[in-house]
Regions:
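Conserved phosphate/anionic-ligand binding catalytic regions in large, soluble enzymes, centered on
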Residues: 1-7, 106-129
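Glycine-rich nucleotide/cofactor/substrate-binding loop typically near the N-terminus or early
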Residues: 8-97, 156-159, 164-169, 173-183, ...
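Mobile "lid/hinge" segments at catalytic clefts and subdomain interfaces of large enzymes
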Residues: 16, 130-237
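Residues at or immediately flanking beta-strands
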Residues: 30, 103-105, 132-134
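Divalent metal-coordination and catalytic microenvironments
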Residues: 46, 113, 186
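Short, glycine/charge-rich beta-strand/loop segments that flank catalytic centers
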Residues: 83-84, 102-110
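Non-catalytic, charge-rich alpha-helical accessory subdomains
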Residues: 95-106, 115
Length: 303
């Protein structure tokens, strides 16, 4: 939902994402962007499509794919951050399973989805223009999750490992609200944690997935916010004294001098994050659920 909300927030985000995914050179892989109603609210959904099952891929395979991607579509800093998130994901699995990093492979069902979710979110976050990302506390959820290694209490082992150093909490949701992939991306993008920044909302993006609880809206909302002046200024037209902030309710980052703000005290899986660079991008987690399938489809398995 982070990817979907960012593509909705950013003008031209849908086209930017589609062209970038095509440039990855993965045979038969594309994205489909559509709109769907979630409890009466229009949201955007992004699906990763594969014409044929992709082979199991280790981290080195993914590194090679990203390295070969043309910088016209995948700037060097996007590649660097994307690979950092994928590496975090693999390292978490390596730690919890006690396996060497080179033995960790991305699940055959979720490998391509994970790559597109991760790199796409970083790309769109960069395109928004924010230079700093701040996240609100991450709701990890509660209850149990079942994947290839059995049934585990939430957060699953890899999620708990990834949550180290992040500001988290657990609401009585009875379900997993923060996936390993989502945590890896957020941890890579966020520079710190804090409340929703003060400012004027310029744009909103709503992202949803396939899961719905029926109890509360399952979407992630992203905001683009123009922050107030840093200091008193005699001339209201003097833009040099103000910041632009972007916030996202469970969404992603922004571009420029902004903040990316994630969930803030809500019952969803993503924390609020805002990037500062004149603009702030924020994302809210006031909705529950996430767009991935069972834990095994968005994490890794070991050989």
């Amino acid at each position: 939902m982070l990817l979907a909300s960012l593509s909705d927030l950013l003008p031209g985000g849908e086209r930017l994402l589609a062209e970038a995914v095509a440039a990855l050179g993965l045979p038969g892989v594309s994205v489909r962007v559509s709109e769907q109603m979630v409890q009466g609210i229009r949201t955007r959904r992004v699906e990763v499509l594969e014409e044929a099952p992709q082979p199991l891929r280790h981290l080195k395979d993914l590194t090679d794919i990203v390295a070969a991607a043309p910088e016209k579509h995948w700037p060097a800093d996007v590649k660097e951050q994307g690979l950092a998130a994928l590496t975090r994901l693999a390292e978490a699995e390596s730690t919890v399973h006690g396996e060497p990093l080179e033995h960790i492979h991305f699940h055959e069902v979720g490998a391509v989805d994970t790559v597109v979710d991760t790199l796409g979110a970083v790309l769109l976050a960069r395109a928004t223009g924010a230079s700093r990302v701040v996240a609100s506390p991450v709701n990890l959820g509660s209850g149990f999750v079942t994947f290839s290694h059995g049934r585990f209490p939430v957060p699953a082992p890899a999620s708990a490992e990834l949550a180290r150093g992040m500001l988290t909490f657990a609401a009585d949701s009875g379900m997993e609200l923060a996936t390993p992939t989502g945590l890896a991306v957020l941890k890579t993008l966020a520079d710190g944690y804090g409340p929703l920044p003060q400012g004027s909302i310029l744009a909103l993006g709503y992202g949803s997935g396939t899961y719905s609880t029926g109890a509360y809206p399952t979407f992630l909302r992203a905001y683009l916010i123009e922050c107030g002046p840093r200091r008193a200024r005699p001339n209201a037209d003097d833009a040099s004294t103000e910041d632009a902030c972007a916030e996202a309710d469970d969404a992603g980052p922004t571009r420029g001098r902004g903040n990316l703000f994630g969930p803030h005290g809500h019952s969803h899986s993503w924390p609020n994050a805002h990037m500062s660079s004149g603009r702030t991008f924020t994302k809210d987690e006031e909705q529950g659920g996430h767009s991935h399938g069972p834990h095994g489809t968005h994490g890794h398995e070991h050989d």
